[in-house]
C-alpha cells in the first residue's frame, strides 16, 4: 500500500463507486488527481528529473452529427508529464460516454471540445487527434524494441514491491541498451483491480543486471498505484540505483473501459517517436 492511498484528494473520485452513466455532454464528469501525491512520496521537487507525457488511446468515442447520425472515432491524447494533474481514468470513461447522444457540428468541434475540457482537468494544454476507424485500422501491431528479459530461468518467491532489487545491479561495462518486459503487473490504487502492462527501458550507462531488473519489475505485482505513478517510480528507482547517463521508460498498458494509458518518461525525450499498439492492446 502506498503512503497516499487514503489521501483526501482520492476520496471524492467516482473510481470504485456505483455511478450513473450520462448520455449528454457533461464536462464536469472529469476528475483530476494531483501528480504531487506520488511525486511527494518519491521526494521529487519542482524540478522534475524527467520529461515526457501520458499517451491515451480512446477506443469508445462516439457522438451524433447534426443530422442525428452516430459517428465513431478512435482518439489519441497526449498529456504532458509537466501538468499538475493526471486525469482519473473512470471519470474519463464517463465523460466520453456523455458524448454518445450529443450533437456536434463537426469532427473538429469534437476535437476542440476534448482539448478544452482535458486541458482544464490536467491544468496544462493537451494534444488530441481523432481518427476514422478505417484510417486507424492500418496501424500495425508491433513488439517493443530491444531484448526481452522475461525468459530467464530464475525462481521468484516474493511479489512485494522492493526497490532494493536494483541495489548493486550495475557492472563496470558501459552500454547503450534497450530492454523490455511483458511481466509488468500492478493494481489500481483505489479498486485493487489488476493492471497489465509491458515496459521498455532504454538507457546508456553501466550495464544493468537483467535478473535484478526483472525481479524489480515483478515486485510491482502486488503494488497499488496508478499507471503513471508506477512508471515514474521505475524511472526514479533506476536513476537512483543505476545512475545511467540517459534513460527512457515507456510502458503500454492493456485497455480498460475503452481506454489504454501509455506513460512515457525520459531524461531527454518529450514524447515517444512512435505510438504503435502491442499485441495485448
Curated annotation (Swiss-Prot):
Subcellular location: Cytoplasm
A GO cellular-component term linked to this record: cytoplasm
Residues annotated for NADPH binding in this entry: 89-90, 256-257
Keyword annotations of the record: Cytoplasm, NADP, Oxidoreductase, Queuosine biosynthesis
Active site positions: 188, 195
Pathway: tRNA modification; tRNA-queuosine biosynthesis
One Pfam family recorded for the sequence: QueF
Catalytic reactions on record: 7-aminomethyl-7-carbaguanine + 2 NADP(+) = 7-cyano-7-deazaguanine + 2 NADPH + 3 H(+)
Main location: cytoplasm
InterPro entries: GTP-CH-I_C/QueF (IPR043133), NADPH_dep_7-cyano-7-deazaG_red (IPR050084), QueF (IPR029500), QueF_N (IPR029139), QueF_type2 (IPR016428)
Residues holding substrate: 87-89, 227-228
GO biological process: queuosine biosynthetic process; tRNA modification
E.C. number(s) listed in UniProt: 1.7.1.13
Gene Ontology MF: a single term: preQ1 synthase activity
HAMAP family assigned to the protein according to its UniProt record, in alphabetical order: QueF_type2
Subunit structure: Homodimer.
NCBIfam families per the UniProt record, alphabetical: QueF
Family: Belongs to the GTP cyclohydrolase I family. QueF type 2 subfamily.
Function recorded in the entry: Catalyzes the NADPH-dependent reduction of 7-cyano-7-deazaguanine (preQ0) to 7-aminomethyl-7-deazaguanine (preQ1).
Designated name of the protein: NADPH-dependent 7-cyano-7-deazaguanine reductase
Natural source organism: Aliivibrio salmonicida (strain LFI1238)
Gene name as annotated: queF
Amino acid at each position: 500500500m502506498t503512503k497516499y492511498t487514503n489521501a483526501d484528494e482520492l476520496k471524492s473520485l467516482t473510481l470504485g463507486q456505483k455511478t450513473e452513466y450520462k448520455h449528454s455532454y457533461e464536462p464536469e464528469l472529469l476528475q483530476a488527481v494531483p501528480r504531487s501525491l506520488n511525486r511527494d512520496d518519491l521526494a521529487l521537487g519542482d524540478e522534475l528529473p524527467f520529461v515526457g507525457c501520458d499517451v491515451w488511446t480512446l477506443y469508445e468515442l462516439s457522438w451524433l452529427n447534426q443530422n442525428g447520425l452516430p459517428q465513431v472515432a478512435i482518439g489519441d491524447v497526449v498529456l504532458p508529464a509537466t501538468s499538475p494533474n493526471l486525469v482519473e481514468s473512470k471519470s474519463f470513461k464517463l465523460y466520453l460516454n456523455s458524448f454518445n447522444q450529443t450533437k456536434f457540428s463537426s469532427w473538429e468541434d469534437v476535437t476542440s471540445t476534448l482539448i478544452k475540457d482535458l486541458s482544464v482537468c490536467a491544468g496544462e494544454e493537451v494534444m488530441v487527434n481523432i481518427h476514422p476507424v478505417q484510417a486507424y485500422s492500418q496501424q500495425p501491431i508491433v513488439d517493443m524494441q530491444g531484448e526481452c528479459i522475461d525468459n530467464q530461468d530464475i525462481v521468484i518467491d516474493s511479489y512485494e514491491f522492493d526497490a532494493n532489487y536494483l541495489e548493486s545491479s550495475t557492472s563496470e561495462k558501459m552500454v547503450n541498451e534497450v530492454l523490455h518486459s511483458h511481466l509488468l503487473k500492478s493494481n489500481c490504487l483505489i479498486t485493487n483491480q489488476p493492471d497489465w502492462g509491458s515496459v521498455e527501458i532504454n538507457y546508456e550507462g553501466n550495464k544493468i543486471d537483467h535478473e535484478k531488473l526483472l525481479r524489480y519489475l515483478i515486485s510491482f505485482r502486488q503494488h497499488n498505484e496508478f499507471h503513471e505513478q508506477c512508471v515514474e517510480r521505475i524511472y526514479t528507482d533506476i536513476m537512483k540505483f543505476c545512475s545511467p547517463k540517459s534513460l527512457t521508460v515507456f510502458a503500454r498498458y492493456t485497455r480498460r473501459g475503452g481506454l489504454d494509458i501509455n506513460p512515457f518518461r525520459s531524461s531527454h525525450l518529450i514524447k515517444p517517436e512512435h505510438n504503435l499498439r502491442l499485441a495485448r492492446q
